[in-house]
């Protein structure tokens, strides 16, 4: 007999044991909630710790295509020092979890961008940096320019500007960290 009056026959089946365990767990959690305790499941706690640790150790791979790449290099230099935020640039896509697309993406470079994105391990994030990467920019009407890298890869954060300042990219990285902590894995373009 359970405290809520439901009786479950004792049997050796796993389904019955799982049901009994779930009922007991729900009653236990409800008892703590009624007394004013903040209750969370262990798996939720582990997920939040993993998201927090993942946000503090972003390893971006640069995909510099034009003048925005110069501003991206400024953020890694001593004045802005991305290392203090746990951001370490990597040269290989297999070691990176963030791709920063900086500059004009041409039709000829689009397959290479997709190939590099596919080589990255999950979870992977993309930051689109600059007007050209966001929507074609100054060369929007050119026949050889892709009108936004989001047509090739899914983008998480858009950093506007022509070229965007190092502070803008730093703010975009901080926004990506907050997005990872919030845990919206399927939401793109925050």
From Swiss-Prot:
Pfam families registered for this protein in UniProt: Oxidored_q6
Binding site for [4Fe-4S] cluster: 67-68, 132, 162
Keywords, sorted A to Z: 4Fe-4S, Cell inner membrane, Cell membrane, Iron, Iron-sulfur, Membrane, Metal-binding, NAD, Quinone, Translocase, Transport, Ubiquinone
Superkingdom assignment: Bacteria
Mode of membrane association: Peripheral membrane protein
Keyword Coiled coil: no
This protein's GO CC annotations: plasma membrane; respiratory chain complex I
Family membership noted in the UniProt record: Belongs to the complex I 20 kDa subunit family.
Note on how the cofactor is bound: Binds 1 [4Fe-4S] cluster.
Name this protein carries in UniProt: NADH-quinone oxidoreductase subunit B
Top enzyme category: translocase
Compartments (UniProt record): Cell inner membrane
Molecular functions (GO terms): 4 iron, 4 sulfur cluster binding; iron ion binding; NADH dehydrogenase (ubiquinone) activity; NADH:ubiquinone reductase (non-electrogenic) activity; quinone binding
Any one Gene Ontology BP term: aerobic respiration
Keyword Magnesium in annotation: no
């Amino acid at each position: 007999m359970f405290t809520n009056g439901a009786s479950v026959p004792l049997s050796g089946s796993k389904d019955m044991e799982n049901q009994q365990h779930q009922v007991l767990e729900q009653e236990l959690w409800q008892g703590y909630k009624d007394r004013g305790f903040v209750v969370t499941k262990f798996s939720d706690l582990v997920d939040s710790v993993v998201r927090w640790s993942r946000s503090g150790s972003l390893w971006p791979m640069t995909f510099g295509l034009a003048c925005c790449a110069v501003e991206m290099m400024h953020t890694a230099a001593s004045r802005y020092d991305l290392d203090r935020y746990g951001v370490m640039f990597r040269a290989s896509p297999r070691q990176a979890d963030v791709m920063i697309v900086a500059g004009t993406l041409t039709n000829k470079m689009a397959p290479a961008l997709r190939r590099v994105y596919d080589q990255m391990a999950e979870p992977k994030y993309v930051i689109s940096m600059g007007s050209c990467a966001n929507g074609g920019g100054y060369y929007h009407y050119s026949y050889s320019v892709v009108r936004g890298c989001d047509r090739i890869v899914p983008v998480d954060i858009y950093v506007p500007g022509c070229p965007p300042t190092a502070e803008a990219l730093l703010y975009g990285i901080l926004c990506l960290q907050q997005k990872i902590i919030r845990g919206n894995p399927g939401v793109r373009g925050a």
